[in-house]
Amino acid sequence: MRVAIVGGTGDFGLALARRLVEAGDEVVIGSRDAERAREKASEVGAAPGAANEEAVSGVDLVVLATKADAAIATATALAEAIGTTPVLSVASDLRSTDALSLAQRAQDLVGGPVVAGLHSLAAGKLAHGRPDEDAFVCGDDEEAKALALELAAKVVAGRALDAGPLSRARALEGMTAVIVSLNKRYKGHAGIRVTGLP
C-alpha cells in the first residue's frame, strides 16, 4: 500500500510511518515544511518526504495525523490535492464539545471518503514496536474502511476491529481522553484489548 501521512513529522505520524515501513508499505511523509519531511523520512526509511500537497499525490490512503487544532484547516487546504483518495483521520480533540467528530467534519471538506481510527494508540508505544492492543476503525465507506483496517492490522500486535459507521468516530476520539486520564492517574501506559470476540 502507498500511504501519505500528513503531519508525518509529529510524534504519532512518525511512529506510524516507522511501523508501516517495517511492514513493507511505501510511506510518504508530508509536512508544511518539505525539508523537515525529507529529514524525518530518511530517519525511518520512508520514501522521500515532501510538502503536504505533493505527499498526497498518487497514494492509496491519506492519513491525517496533524494535531487536532490543525486537522480541519489542513483538510480544507488539501481538499483539492487529496481529491477522491480515502482519508484516515487519527486526530483527537480532547477539549471539543462539538457533537461532530473531527473525522465527520473533515468528511464535509474533502471529496473522498473519510474514516476514523487508531485513537486508542499512544505515539510513545507505537514508536517502539507494535503495541499489544487492538486498534479501532469506523467509517461509512466499506472500501476505505477496509484500507484503514489493513493499515491498522500492520501496526498493532492485537486486532484491527471494525467499530461501525463514521458516527462512532466521536466515541473513538473520546477514547484518547479516557486513556490519557488513566495513564495520569495510575502512572502507566494503558492500551485497549477487547475480549469476548471470536
What are the roles of these predicted feature ranges?
Residues A91-G129:
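Rossmann-fold NAD(P)-binding glycine/threonine-rich loop
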Residues A50, P113-H119, A160-A163:
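General beta-strand structural signal in soluble alpha/beta enzymes
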Residues R2-A4, P86, D134:
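Residues that mark the start of a beta-strand
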Residues M1-E43:
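NAD(P)+-binding Rossmann beta1-loop-alpha1 motif at the extreme N-terminus of oxidoreductases
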Residues K125, E133-P198:
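Active-site-lining helix/loop region of Rossmann-like oxidoreductase modules
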Residues I5-V6, L64, V137:
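Hydrophobic Val/Ile/Leu positions in short beta-strands of Rossmann-like dinucleotide-binding domains
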Residues N52-P86:
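Rossmann-like NAD(P)-binding element
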